[in-house]
Amino acid sequence: MSNYYAALALTLLAGISTGIGSLLALMVNHTNKKFLTFALGFSAGIMLYVSFVEIMPQSGQTLAEEMPKHAAGWITTAAFFGGMLFIWLIDQLVPNFENPHEMSMIGTMNTAPSEEARLHRMGIFTAAAIAIHNFPEGLAVFFSALSNPDLGVVIAATIALHNIPEGMAVAVPIYFATKSRMKAFSYSFLSGLAEPLGAIIGYALLKPFLSPLVFACVLGGVAGIMVYISLDELLPAAEEYGEHHIAISGLILGMGVMAVSLLMLA
């Protein structure tokens, strides 16, 4: 039970980082785009490396203890792509205009009165879109932490870093539309709470069926979710903010840091 609460706490911390993003957006006039580019690339490197080197092998190894090795390989692969399919389907629910991947509006808002209604709508829909996306991210953090608390800390920190610019994407249009810092912060903060909510709902649905076999399949799906987030959200957002080579440098360094961390935890 203590692992459950620790995993939930990590998921909550990852989720509320959207609020940190809103505070940063409201406190500073200009976003350091080079830093954001590097940070998003760094996050992608961590998530890609840990998915392929740690989570996928762990899923396959657990399944191999429950069934023939050949069948375990097929099921691990199916779970991985099933996780990708799951978050892709969620992605299709969000119109492109409100999709949180499209965050180029940060720092470029027009404050003309004629824009206020459009900006308000943009902020609300962006908050809703991020809330939808945070459900599977919450599952990824929660089940990673249940499997390995040390790994859960790394995943939670990575997701938290990823959530900061999403918090900015919610706060900026809401603030320019309403001139209310409290409203901008509230929408951003609440969108992040979908992350622990997704973890609680997912755990409640799966708890009656949890076994080493099911848990291994969930981990395979988590790896797929994390790879999708890296390739569909983090790297494109890093490119959107600016310099390609800075993003790639962050990606490589993220992989290196994750590799050293796993070796030290082994």
From Swiss-Prot:
Entry's localization field: Cell inner membrane
Annotated TM spans: 8-28, 35-55, 70-90, 123-143, 152-172, 185-205, 209-229, 246-266
Catalytic reactions on record: Zn(2+)(in) = Zn(2+)(out)
Residues at which Zn(2+) binds: E137, H162, E166
Keyword Membrane: yes
Stretch forming the signal peptide: none
GO molecular-function term, one example from the UniProt record: zinc ion transmembrane transporter activity
Similarity comment text for this entry: Belongs to the ZIP transporter (TC 2.A.5) family. ZupT subfamily.
Reported function: Mediates zinc uptake. May also transport other divalent cations.
NCBIfam families in alphabetical order: PRK04201.1 (NF003243)
Protein name (database record): Zinc transporter ZupT
Organism: Chlorobium limicola (strain DSM 245 / NBRC 103803 / 6330)
Phylogenetic classification of the source organism: Bacteria, Pseudomonadati, Chlorobiota, Chlorobiia, Chlorobiales
